[in-house]
Amino acid sequence: MLLHDLAEQKLIHPPKWLPDNLAYLAIVGSESYGANLPGTSDQDLQGFCVPPKSDVFPHLRGEIPGFGRQHQRFGDWQEHHIKQGGKEYDFAVYSIVKFFHLAMENNPNVLDIICVPENCIKHMNKVGQLVRDNRRAFFHAGCFHKFRGYASAQMAAIERGANRANTKRAASIEAHGYDTKFLMHVMRLALECEQILLTGDLDLKRDSQFLLSVRRGDMTLEEGKAWWASKARDLETAYTNCKAVPLEPDEDAIKGLLMQALEMHYGDLSEAVRLETPVEKILADIDVILSKYRV
């Protein structure tokens, strides 16, 4: 596996436990959208892992949240510009807990990770397969606010001439007058959001030819602005009339999926978590009602 190889060569320095507990790793970015340009050697790899049990459940090591010494919990590991074999890698691997939280918030970059085409998956164990198979559980209409916000920020960056000092983008800006990759991302985010709102699913390569043409500079900046203004109105309509996904995340269902994934990795969690049974919940609700009438 790539992480093992790079760690053994001391080219990357993840936590020692991470390579053996990696659940999912995928190629993200332009390659996963089918919009990468010829000759590009950079590869963005992102995914999630399952940290040690005491990191997810700190009470198992005697830690009481808010009292005394608190151990720093693992959130994510990132390393960039790792060169090997003619390629340059950027890594970002999240704790499964952080990953679930960001996915539940419909963070665009995180949702993309579990929606890449199968040929972009570099590593996937049974936990990773479970999460990918249930990716639609994370989708909700809140994607409208998240994706639109990201797209608007990208468009604002284009208009203020961002990335002119970036040597990798300078040629594109010089040739077209703006950062074509930024405009591609504006359109990608809008089209992904529209897919989720209308279909309840996400196919990253659906619009690959269109996105590639935008990245090549086949659209003027004025045409791009007009496209975004029109699509923003379409998104408002799709959000208002959305029926393909729930309005809000189903936190209980997502938490249940997280617990299923953790049990798949750790085994029995009865010593770590006590889940209330339906009968216990009913009895507790009855007790609350009766307590209102007790003298």
Residue ranges and their predicted role:
Residues 1-11, 17, 294-295:
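N-terminal regions immediately upstream of nucleotidyltransferase
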Residues 9, 137, 144, 148-161, ...:
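Structured mid-to-C-terminal alpha-helical surface segments
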Residues 11-60:
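Active-site nucleotide-donor binding segment shared across nucleotidyl transfer reactions
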Residues 43-47, 64-68, 121:
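Short, low-complexity, polar/charged sequence segments that are solvent-exposed and flexible
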Residues 52, 60-71:
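Short, His- and charge-rich active-site/binding loops that engage polyanionic ligands
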Residues 52, 106, 196:
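Phosphate/oxyanion-binding loops and surfaces in catalytic or ligand/nucleic-acid-binding neighborhoods
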Residues 55-59, 112, 195-203:
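Short, solvent-exposed secondary-structure capping/transition elements
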Residues 69-193, 204, 208, 212:
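Conserved NTP/Mg2+-binding pocket subregion across the NTase superfamily
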